Amino acid sequence: MSKLKKAGILFAILIAGAASWVYFYWMNTPAYAAGEIQKAVQSHDYDLLAYRVDLNKVYSAAIDDSADVLSKDGEKDHRTAASLLRSLKSPIADELVHQTQLRFQGKKKESSLFDEPVNAITSYLGFTTLTITQCLSIEEKGDQAIVSVRVHDRKLKHDFTWKVLMEKDVNGTWCATRILNLKDYMRER
């Protein structure tokens, strides 16, 4: 084989290796994960959503934030509701995950013991009227990243910016775990 052919083959191998490295590096960035979350929401791909969003953590944190806002608004009934939410956090979060799965799979919602608290919290948070419109920015700090996401509330006809905390696991996979400014969003809403 001539030196020119060997150099050409070596060059092609180097280019393929560099392209592979860039691709696999990109797959392990919070920007890629945020794009996959948006893709999962748009295509109703529950498996991809569950891979990139720790739904149990997100819902548990949302319940905590809701209970905190309710308990501090000064109304006695809201303090009682907040206390009830906190005590039932785990089963309500599990039910929210289950309902998300059913919604993404296009299945009919099943009746549950927790229908009333789940409906109350989703209505209170306005989750059913929200759409993700744009990923605005990503600030990566070690094994955590804060992704600013613009969401649109169809009922209020208003845009909000959520600060979503993403964490990297031991395998290098980025996963959304919490909406950092959910309390601010609830107060605005």
Q: Model features per residue range: what roles?
A:
Residues 29-45:
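Alpha-helical transmembrane signal-anchor/signal-peptide segments
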Residues 119-189:
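Short beta-strand edge/turn micro-motifs at domain boundaries
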Residues 9, 87, 91, 95, ...:
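N-terminal non-globular leader segments, chiefly Sec-dependent signal peptides
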Residues 78-135:
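Structured, soluble extracytoplasmic/luminal domains of envelope-associated proteins
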Residues 7-27:
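Hydrophobic membrane-insertion alpha-helices, especially the h-region
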Residues 52-98:
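Extracytoplasmic/periplasmic/luminal assembly and interaction segments
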Residues 48-49:
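Solenoid-repeat scaffolds in large eukaryotic assemblies
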Residues 1-6:
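Positively charged n-region of N-terminal signal peptides that target proteins for export
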